[in-house]
Amino acid sequence: MKDIIIASFYKFIPLNDFESLREPILTKMHEIGIKGTIILAHEGVNGGFAGNREQMNVFYDYLRSDSRFADLHFKETYDNKNPFDKAKVKLRKEIVTMGVQKVDPSYNTGTYLSPEEWHQFIQDPNVILLDTRNDYEYELGTFKNAINPDIENFREFPDYVQRNLIDKKDKKIAMFCTGGIRCEKTTAYMKEQGFQHVYQLHDGILNYLESIPESESLWEGKCFVFDDRVAVDQKLDRVYPQLPQDYKYEREQK
């Protein structure tokens, strides 16, 4: 039985006091025994952390005790050991760095599709299926017929759109990422640019893998995750027990 719960979450919401939230959250993580990384910025909060069920429930309640976080949704996966080695709370300019100002995912994002809706939608040959992740993530696994933007980091995505998609504003574009947060920004950016039909996989690839039977799945390969599991398969089991050196630098920049 897998006793460790791994939770990922995010919320785009203005946090004028985000700097003052760091120490209380970090103190609570140490107090409970939670390990993981939480990122705070003016635009909101993003993170992943892990512990046993009792620890996680206590920390969920703590975070939700702030009225701004009362509706936080935690996406859970499970493992036999904690994939994080310590507790960290970081202050950043963005909770996921795209480097484009005046993009507000708190109100202007793509249309959410459930895993079941997504499964049907991306089989339409008229849909442009776009992987918003980095090139090494794409190489590990992606959806059948997905386009690889061939980017080394998320900051390069806007340039990809300007070079390759700007003349396709009337097309249906389906976008996906690991857990959903990058798609919040990419779809918001594209709507700001005038794209009319933008869709995103709700809660990302991990939600699809959990929801769609492997025998029917349109996912091919493994899914990279930003913790010491490195990647998971279609059953959400870890693929590599140790972290390859190739991915260390990217993880440390998160």
Swiss-Prot record:
InterPro entries reported in the protein's UniProt record: Rhodanese-like_dom (IPR001763), Rhodanese-like_dom_sf (IPR036873), TrhO (IPR020936), TRHO_N (IPR040503)
Active site positions: C177
A GO molecular function held by the record: oxidoreductase activity, acting on paired donors, with incorporation or reduction of molecular oxygen
Record key words, sorted: Oxidoreductase, tRNA processing
Catalysed conversion reaction: uridine(34) in tRNA + AH2 + O2 = 5-hydroxyuridine(34) in tRNA + A + H2O
SMART domains on file: RHOD (SM00450)
Enzyme Commission number, as recorded: 1.14.-.-
Example GO biological process: tRNA modification
Source superkingdom: Bacteria
The keyword Iron-sulfur appears for this protein: no
Pfam families from the UniProt entry: Rhodanese, UPF0176_N
Family the UniProt entry places it in: Belongs to the TrhO family.
Protein name per its UniProtKB record: tRNA uridine(34) hydroxylase
Native source organism of the sequence: Legionella pneumophila (strain Paris)
